[in-house]
Amino acid sequence: MKVGKVSENVLKRAVFKQIRHRRKEVLVRGGIGEDCAAVDIGDDEVAVLSTDPITGAAKEIGTLAVHITANDIASSGAEVIGILTSIILPEGTREIALRRMMQEIEEVCSQLEIEVVGGHTEVSNAVNQPLITVTGIGKIKKSKLLSTKGLEP
């Protein structure tokens, strides 16, 4: 496969055809054009989740990572309440670079009233540039949930 996002046809054949719907609590599953999942957590509350990797960005990678994931969740009408970060750094990365990424992430989270609720950080020779994946968690009343499938700017 080529570098970049996997094509729609490959996603349909290799990913979505392999996934089965098992839980009635899952109201919306990710799919073509659907960036969020929605899970009924009771009392007319729905948890909205989305995850995005950031690759190839050298400047403000932490800022970009939070904004992209928060935007996905906000597009469903949900309030973003927290994020989990997975940061994989190439061998030789200096601690100051990691500190800057986390400062960017925390600055954006502060502006948006989002909490960093957890994550994972490691150095690996499997990557040659930083890879940040942010998973966002939001909440909304079930009756207010919007599907992002097919939305256009």
Region locations from a protein language model:
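Extreme N-terminal cap/leader segments of soluble proteins
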Residues: 1-57, 76, 85, 103-117, ...
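A glycine-rich phosphate/pyrophosphate-binding beta-strand-loop-alpha-helix module
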Residues: 60-137
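Acidic/histidine-enriched ion/cofactor-binding microenvironments in catalytic or ligand-binding pockets
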Residues: 139-153
